[in-house]
Amino acid sequence: MAYKPQFYPGATKVAENRRNHLNPNYELEKLREIPDEDVVKIMGHRQPGEDYKTVHPPLEEMDMPADYVRDLVEPLNGAKEGHRVRYIQFADSMYFAPAQPYDRSRLYMIRLRGVDAGTLSGRQVVECRESDLEEFSKNLLMDTELFDPATSGVRGATVHGHSLRLDENGMMFDALQRCVFDEKTGHVMYVKDQVGKPLDQPVDVGEPMPEAKLREITTIYRKDGIAMRTDPEVIEVVKRIHRARTLGGYIPTNEIFKGL
């Protein structure tokens, strides 16, 4: 019998949203169309139209020793061409943002190849070959329901603000003011790249989601939304993991896991 992954425990809407993010067969809703060159501008690693910098020759030109693993694993296009590794980093507001750091890392590892993810309490960075990074940053991370212009921020540095209250326009605090709310259009405009360097022209990333939409798709448990304690299966799994880590440590024994 084929194994059917559960991805995440729980019966609440938040648990369902987390499962959807982690399930590669689930198609995330596309909400906007940000031009490729605008994503490149926000990331700030190269100018639109500029050639990709490389760190080694194309793989087909390299004389490498035989390796069974290399023969089994199809390299990413960026690896084939020798493109350098670059990053994109997101901060997600605790006020019902669609995604959050651990959710991002889990879905990156499941849905993507050739990535390295770093997870902190209020930000999440992912690294990859530059050309591949640009492709999935647009199509997966910014054009879909994973991104809300007001409560999700592309922030390569000075990420603070994820735990602060939203402003009158529903915008998450940003010490570098990388993006602003345009009251005329109702859209969010990036005026700086992810590390705070001013852009020549503002980049329009669309209008913020309504709070009702955020509450519907968020992966964040909140007491004033859907509390984690209302989901018995999630609590059971979290307690089991915590107990196993606390008592088992680096030397897990059968006695430790009895009754878990």
Curated annotation (Swiss-Prot):
Reaction(s) this enzyme catalyzes, per UniProt: coenzyme B + methyl-coenzyme M = methane + coenzyme M-coenzyme B heterodisulfide
Residues that bind coenzyme M: R123
A GO BP annotation: methanogenesis
Enzyme class: transferase
SUPFAM superfamilies per the UniProt record, alphabetical: Methyl-coenzyme M reductase subunits
One GO CC term on file: cytoplasm
GO molecular function: coenzyme-B sulfoethylthiotransferase activity
Cofactor annotation comment: Binds 2 coenzyme F430 non-covalently per MCR complex. Coenzyme F430 is a yellow nickel porphinoid. Methyl-coenzyme-M reductase is activated when the enzyme-bound coenzyme F430 is reduced to the Ni(I) oxidation state.
EC numbers: 2.8.4.1
Localization in the cell: Cytoplasm
Keyword Cytoplasm included in the entry's annotation: yes
Pathway the protein contributes to: One-carbon metabolism; methyl-coenzyme M reduction; methane from methyl-coenzyme M: step 1/1
Pfam families for the chain: MCR_gamma
Obligatory cofactor(s): coenzyme F430
Keywords from the UniProt entry: Cytoplasm, Methanogenesis, Transferase
Family per record: Belongs to the methyl-coenzyme M reductase gamma subunit family.
Protein function: Component of the methyl-coenzyme M reductase (MCR) I that catalyzes the reductive cleavage of methyl-coenzyme M (CoM-S-CH3 or 2-(methylthio)ethanesulfonate) using coenzyme B (CoB or 7-mercaptoheptanoylthreonine phosphate) as reductant which results in the production of methane and the mixed heterodisulfide of CoB and CoM (CoM-S-S-CoB). This is the final step in methanogenesis.
Subunit-structure text: MCR is a hexamer of two alpha, two beta, and two gamma chains, forming a dimer of heterotrimers.
Protein name per its UniProtKB record: Methyl-coenzyme M reductase subunit gamma
Organism: Methanococcus vannielii
Gene that specifies this protein: mcrG
